[in-house]
């Protein structure tokens, strides 16, 4: 059939609305939603005809496409996915998962009125920051604390408060890009601090900072390169040395430690990453870090340090523009409460638990998933193998975590096609592909995910 005839055969919306099956959907859904979905179905087939992708279609094809489109239009665009990549803090998949305590706290304050900015003891207006400030101080040892909506905002607010129209001295090797083309120099520019780069990419000495201090210097800045490592012939100035230099010239020292861990991972066999507590113990005046990376909480920028500097930031007009909402506060409070006991934090905060859980545990889980797939899915090959997971989220660069995975292949469908179908399934499953094998890393899977994975694999060849 030629293209013109195919286009003429496309049904009209008015005709389809008279059909019994469409009428059933009209009874359950708004007319606007049904008509829009019908139009999308017809437009789809018109496009396929014009591209010469089809040489025939039936009315039933159009109706079936309408049904799928209607269901998709009814569903929310922001949905849960199953992370089988083994990347624990997956930036594109929402970073850290919240602890049960944090989720319960969010639900409680979201479905009810709350004392967000109300002091129950005094019966007067209160501060939203008071709900978490004492907790942050308790788990970090800081004099004072406040929270904004992300770490870039925390850096911008701190720099704007400490050295607006003044100079911030930073090592050239620490001018990192934090993802999505957001760079530390650009954040500094918007804070209205003047960047002064010192040293070289791989080596910076204390005298590089000292030689650039003048009457217009506002802050000595140290940025932890949490998303990359420079190896070999390197040199950087320690926090202790910077604090001594700051004291000598009466300048505040600020450190952005990015991922912001409260747990010393070197105790568990990982490469040492600076903790918030260690930076404060060394005398750093202001420390900024993220809430949704190594902390395992919601997206937030946490600022801790000397009270005189934090108090100034609270009064900065930028603070209102950067403030967090009640749900973030509730999630952060629930997360921080877990940190009162480190063992409890590791058990209850999914991010910490996934990173620190042993390889042996995941071997048993991988074997369990493989058995369930083999017992329920035909025409696929499944095998358990050793592999490596990643921390992700711009944290612990170069660190790999031994794990076990289930590798999948089939003579009837390519690994790339399996990946695509799983990604586009009702409950999207995000996997890795390597050497024509699909890789399911159980480190980032929950037991509840196994049933869904089995059901989606059963549909792949249909």
Swiss-Prot record:
Cellular component GO terms held in the UniProt record: cytoplasm
UniProt entry keywords in alphabetical sequence: Cytoplasm, Protein biosynthesis, Pyridoxal phosphate, Selenium, Transferase
N6-(pyridoxal phosphate)lysine modification, residue list: 293
InterPro entries: PyrdxlP-dep_Trfase (IPR015424), PyrdxlP-dep_Trfase_major (IPR015421), SelA-like (IPR018319), SelA_trans (IPR004534), SelA_trans_N_dom (IPR025862)
Disulfide bonds, paired cysteine numbers: none
Catalytically driven reaction(s): L-seryl-tRNA(Sec) + selenophosphate + H(+) = L-selenocysteinyl-tRNA(Sec) + phosphate
Alphabetized GO MF terms: L-seryl-tRNA(Sec) selenium transferase activity
Pathway(s) served: Aminoacyl-tRNA biosynthesis; selenocysteinyl-tRNA(Sec) biosynthesis; selenocysteinyl-tRNA(Sec) from L-seryl-tRNA(Sec) (bacterial route): step 1/1
Cofactor(s), by name: pyridoxal 5'-phosphate
Top EC category: transferase
Record EC number: 2.9.1.1
First-listed, main subcellular location of the protein, grouped into a coarse class: cytoplasm
One GO term of the biological process aspect: conversion of seryl-tRNAsec to selenocys-tRNAsec
Protein localization: Cytoplasm
Similarity comment: family membership: Belongs to the SelA family.
Functional summary from the UniProt entry: Converts seryl-tRNA(Sec) to selenocysteinyl-tRNA(Sec) required for selenoprotein biosynthesis.
Annotated protein name in UniProt: L-seryl-tRNA(Sec) selenium transferase
Organism encoding this protein: Clostridium botulinum (strain 657 / Type Ba4)
């Amino acid at each position: 059939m030629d293209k013109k005839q195919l286009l003429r055969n496309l049904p009209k919306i008015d005709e389809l609305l008279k059909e019994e099956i469409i009428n059933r959907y009209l009874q359950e859904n708004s007319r606007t939603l049904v008509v829009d979905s019908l139009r999308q179905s017809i437009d789809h087939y018109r496009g396929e005809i014009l591209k010469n992708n089809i040489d025939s279609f039936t009315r039933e094809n159009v109706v079936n496409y309408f049904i799928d489109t209607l269901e998709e239009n009814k569903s929310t665009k922001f949905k849960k996915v199953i992370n089988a990549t083994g990347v624990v803090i997956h930036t594109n998949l929402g970073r850290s998962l919240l602890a049960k305590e944090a989720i319960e706290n969010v639900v409680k304050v979201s479905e009810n009125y709350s004392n967000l900015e109300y002091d129950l003891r005094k019966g007067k207006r209160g501060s939203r920051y008071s709900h978490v400030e004492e907790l942050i101080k308790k788990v970090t040892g800081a004099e004072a604390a406040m929270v904004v909506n992300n770490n870039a905002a925390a850096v911008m607010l701190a720099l704007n408060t400490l050295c607006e129209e003044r100079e911030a001295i930073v090592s050239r090797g620490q001018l990192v890009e934090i993802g999505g083309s957001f760079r530390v120099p650009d954040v500094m520019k918007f804070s209205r601090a003047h960047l002064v780069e010192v040293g070289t990419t791989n080596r910076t000495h204390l005298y590089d900072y000292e030689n650039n201090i003048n009457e217009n210097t506002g802050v000595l800045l140290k940025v932890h390169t949490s998303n990359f490592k420079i190896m070999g012939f390197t040199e950087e100035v320690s926090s202790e040395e910077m604090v001594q230099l700051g004291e000598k010239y009466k300048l505040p020292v600020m450190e952005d430690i990015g991922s912001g861990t409260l747990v010393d991972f070197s105790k568990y066999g990982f490469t040492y990453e600076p903790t918030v507590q260690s930076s404060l113990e060394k005398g750093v005046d202001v420390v900024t870090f993220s809430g949704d990376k190594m902390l395992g909480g919601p997206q937030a920028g946490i600022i801790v340090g000397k009270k005189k500097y934090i108090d100034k930031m609270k009064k900065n007009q930028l603070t209102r523009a950067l403030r967090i909402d009640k749900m973030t506060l509730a999630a952060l409070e629930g997360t921080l409460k877990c940190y009162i006991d480190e063992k409890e934090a590791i058990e209850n905060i999914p991010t910490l638990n996934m990173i620190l859980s042993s390889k042996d545990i995941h071997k048993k889980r991988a074997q369990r998933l493989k058995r369930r797939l083999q017992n329920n899915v035909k025409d696929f090959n499944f095998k358990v193998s050793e592999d490596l997971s990643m921390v992700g989220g711009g944290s612990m660069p170069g660190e790999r975590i031994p794990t076990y995975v289930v590798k999948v292949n089939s003579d009837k469908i390519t690994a790339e096609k399996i990946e695509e179908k799983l990604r586009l399934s009702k409950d999207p499953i995000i996997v890795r592909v390597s050497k024509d094998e699909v890789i399911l890393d159980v480190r980032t899977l929950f037991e509840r995910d196994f049933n869904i994975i089995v059901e989606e694999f059963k549909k792949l060849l249909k």
